[in-house]
Amino acid sequence: MVWSMYEAEGLFQSQEEIDNWPLDQDGQGNATLAPGDIKYKDQDGNHVLDTKDLIYVKNSSNPDFNFSLRLGASYKGFFVNVMFQGATGYQQNIKELYTTNSGSLQRFQKYHLTDTWTPDNPGASLPRIKFATANDNNRKESTFWVRDCDFLRLKSLSLGYALQPAVLKKLKLTSASIALQGSNLVTWSSLSDLGMDPESLRGYPIQRSYGITSVSYTHLRAHETLRH
C-alpha cells in the first residue's frame, strides 16, 4: 500500500520567503499563506500545485519488526527483572491529530502550544496555529505529517528482595518476597517531544503505573478423608 501526497519542504519562515516562492500553493498567488505554513515541492515545474505534484510514499503503518527483551538478575536475596519492548520500520500520518475539526477542542493537546511555529519558535516541528477550512494549505496530505514511529519502551521493572531460607524456616514459610514494580516507565521515540505515544496515537496514551507487591507461601499439608 502507498500514500498519495505532496512532498513537503519545511515551513515558511518569513513573508519575504513566501513572496519569492515560485510555486502557487493556494491558487491565489500564495496570498492566503503566512510564515509557519507548510511549503511544497513543485514536482513538474509548472509553478502550480496540482495533482501532477503528488508523489507515492510507501504506507509503512505496520512495523517491520516487533521485539521484546527480558533480563533478570539476583544476588543474596535481592533481585531485578526488566522487560523492554519496541518496534522498528514503521511510520504514521499524524495530520488528523494536529488538525482538529470545529467543535473538537477536547482534542487540543499540549503540543499544539509548545511545538507549533511562532516567530519565537521558528524551529518548531508543527505549523502555526490557525482557523482553517478543509482545503487549507496545511491540511493537505503531505510528507510533512509522516513521522517515524520507531520506539523502545521500558515496559516493566521489578526491584525486590526475597527472604532467605533461614528466615523462612523461622517464620514457617516456604517463600516470601516484596518488590517495587512499575510499568511503561520510559519510552524513547521521536514522537516523545510531541507528547504522542507511538503505540496509541489515536487513543488514550498508555499510562505509567507503580506499585508494591508482596507474596508469601506457607507450608501446606494435604489431607485425604477415606470413606468406608
Residue positions per predicted region:
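Extracytoplasmic gating/loop element in the C-terminal half of outer-membrane beta-barrel translocons
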Residues: 1-13, 20-26, 30-33, 87-178, ...
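Outer-envelope beta-barrel architecture signal
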Residues: 65-67, 76-78, 150, 172-176, ...
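Outer-membrane beta-barrel translocator domains and adjoining extracellular loop/strand segments
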Residues: 93-99, 190-197
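Acidic, glycine-anchored loop motifs typical of Ca2+
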Residues: 27, 31, 42-53
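Membrane-embedded beta-strand positions in outer-membrane beta-barrel channels/transporters
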Residues: 68-70, 156-160, 211-213
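Conserved small/polar residues in nucleotide/adenosyl-binding loops
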Residues: 218-225
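Residue-level signature of outer-membrane beta-barrel architecture
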Residues: 73-75, 84-86, 161-165, 214-216
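Membrane-embedded beta-strand positions of outer-membrane beta-barrel proteins
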Residues: 82, 178-180, 214
